[in-house]
Amino acid sequence: MNNNNNNNEGVSSSSSSSSSPLPNISSPNLISNSNIENDIEIKKKSNNNNNNIFEGDNSHIYNQFLGEDFNVVHYTSNALKVSSISLSLNTLTSCTRELGQELTENITTNYDDLFKLANNIKELDQLTDTLKLGVSNLEESIQRMKNDISEPYNKVKSHIGQLKRVQDSCELLRKLIRYIQLVKKLKNHLQAGSRDLSKSAQCINEINLLKKDSDLTGINIIDSQVVWIKTCSDQIITISSTLLYQGMENQNQTDVANSLQVFHNMTILNEKVYSIVNLTTEKVIKNIKALLNVNKLIADLPKTTITNNINNNNSNNNITTNNNNNNYNNNNNNNNNNNIISTSTDKSIWLKFESLIDTLYSSLIQILHLQRVLLKIKDPLTHKSLMEVLLIKQHQLQQQQQQQQQQQQQQQQQQQQQQQQQQQVGTTSNNTQPILIEMISTLFWKSILKVLENNLLVAAKSSNIIENTFIREYPKVSKFFLDFIKKLQNYIDIHQMDIQQQFMIVLSNINQIIGNNNSNNSNSNSNNSIESSLSTSSSSSSSSSSSSSTTTTATTSLILLSADDYKLSLFKSIGLFEKAYLEYSQSKMSTIVNGLFPQSTWSSRSTLPVIPNGKQLVDLSKTIWSEIEWLVGNNDRQLLGKLMLVVSKVIDLFSSKIESMVQPPGLIVLNSNIGSSSSTGGVNNNSNSNNNNEIITINENSKPTPSQTVNTLLFNVSIQLNSSIQSLLTSQPLERESIIVIEKSLNSLITICTNIITPLMNSFFTHIEQIFSTIHNEDWYNEKTTKMLINKSNQTCSSYMESFKTLVNYFQNQYLMRFTPCQLLNNQIKSMISKIFIVYLKYCSLLKQPFSENGKLKMVNDLTHLEFAVTPLLVSGGIKEIGESYNLIRNYKQSIFN
């Protein structure tokens, strides 16, 4: 009965499998949940029994066999070591018997559950057979579906392949047609000549792009024209390069623009432009090195000059005398020979230097013209100027190079040990250079200045001829440079003003691109730091350091250099020679000043000091004048201002020398018998007086002391130099700042002169005041008419006025006549005369009034003699220039009879 049921179930399952490939597994033949629960209970019971066995007296024996590290050999060897082997066997036998008894009890207790589990296994086998039958039915269904689908699929696949090949063929035919059309256009453009060079270049570029995008090798029509197209490309590049060079030399904007457009169309603009800049730079560098080649300079000297110099030297060496004059003449001959060689060398240097400046100017003008055309010409597709395209391409190339360097640095960094990573990171960050974008004119100019400065320094260190030439005749170098800057200024004013707007557009676009790139780099670095923070702490620090060290930044230095920028940088390159020239000029003039004063101090016990004479001062003035006039003629205001500082220092040195030689004025005492011809004058040394002052008694026969003579000579020397420098300041178009600097030094010289003349004037005025104090001894109130008043033709003055006239005459003849007339002396005399008038009026006002008629006439007569006595003292002008004090004298004279 059960077998029939099973057969029926198999039939039903087979019938169902025909309709569905999968069997119906939701039948009552599956293992129920109750059976699973019974299994769990049986396991629990067995576990409880096991726990009872293993927790008994023999638990330690069972635990030995249950351990994972149980070893039969080890256990057997331990059992053999025991003294009673039979006891161990009995123990194992009893344990085995106990385990067998435990198993029998578990089987007897749970036999129902064990039978159920066996029945479930039989049902599981039946279910497995049913599942296998369903799987086989499913495979048959899939095979039938595969057969139904594969045939149309293969047909569609075949049609798709055919369509793809047709499309590829059409695409290839279109490219061939385009290629043939471009070749035809290229031939037409080439027949037109240089007018269509840019179009020919565009055709060649498109042909190259077609060949690059798709593999056209193996096609006869293309392979046959590869060599011809390459020849045409080389020919176009050659013609365009020649046209570009000619356009740059002739300043032809059309030729340069056409050539640049050709290079741009052929995608070689960046390469060609920088190649031209490098070639132009090398040409100038070659001229610089040729100029500063000492051996070549000596080789270029005239052979006759060198031969004559050798003969003269030999003849001079054969003459030996003990006379100092002859030795001096021999030295002069040698110096003259050296001067001849130096002069010939100088001529050769300046000729080459002039050629260098011309080459530098022409090369710079060519680069500026090229830059100007690059700014003006635009790409017809993007409408960007070619300069912008050039700079962007250059920026990309530099960025790629720097990224490659950074990748190499990172690879090296990863290969090093972990302890050295921080040190390597710091080194990497220092080696990372920001990308600098500059105009081509700036690149050219920087390269030239660097080479010029380095070669000048090397040549100066290796040759005294070049060093002396460029130092002693530095104004010539400055003159060449100023002429260069002047011509460059004219060119910039004419040709550079029309590209300011285009330059500002390029500058804005480049800054925007660089800003975007820098922001992208910063974002990528921040992302790297975030990713590194998710890793371990040690790797995080190294990753963040590495990311910070590989940051790529770009900066711009896009400026159109003005003439002032070129001038500043050009003169900066020869700044050392300018400094040396100023030091040389100062040394030359200081040597002359020191030669004027071989003895800077002097005392009354020694001989008279050596005072510079007029010829020596003329030589000093000529030296100063020649240096300044040289620079004024060159219109070198900047160097002239620096030279004026040097002249100021020389004048200060002269002033210090003069000041150190000025002698104390002494204490001048007026002799009481100054009106007597028998009185004598001289110098009396008072032992109780100050050592720096001497008591000098003067009268009409006395003469100035040696100290006063020295001071007078020093005054005259200072005034002569001051007058010469003042004439220079007024005759030359100097800057106001330079004039102020020189006048400041001249004021110190004038101060010394004032200190020389002022004590003498004060002493003279003191004596005059003493004479005027005797006016009270005169009789101003006697009415008697004297012979003096009757005989007016031989009219004389009062006795005090006679003494005054004698003193004035003595002072003028013995002192004032020795001083060089100048404005300072005239001002001092005017001031003294003004004080004389004031003090005379003071004493007159102290006289008792009224005067007698005789006294009034006498006073008027004295006033007249006073005017006549002081008038000869004035260096220039009349007595009326005294001013207010003279007006007071006139008014007082008129008021006597009122």
Swiss-Prot record:
Keyword Protein transport: yes
Biased segments, Low complexity type: 679-702
Membrane topology: Peripheral membrane protein
Protein name: Conserved oligomeric Golgi complex subunit 5
Coiled-coil stretches noted in the UniProt entry, renumbered to this chain: 129-192
Organism the protein comes from: Dictyostelium discoideum (Social amoeba)
GO cellular component, one term: Golgi membrane
A single BP term in Gene Ontology: protein transport
Compartments where found: Golgi apparatus membrane
Membrane found in the keyword field: yes
This protein's UniProt keywords: Coiled coil, Golgi apparatus, Membrane, Protein transport, Transport
Region described as Disordered: 1-30, 311-339, 519-551, 679-705
Domain of life: Eukaryota
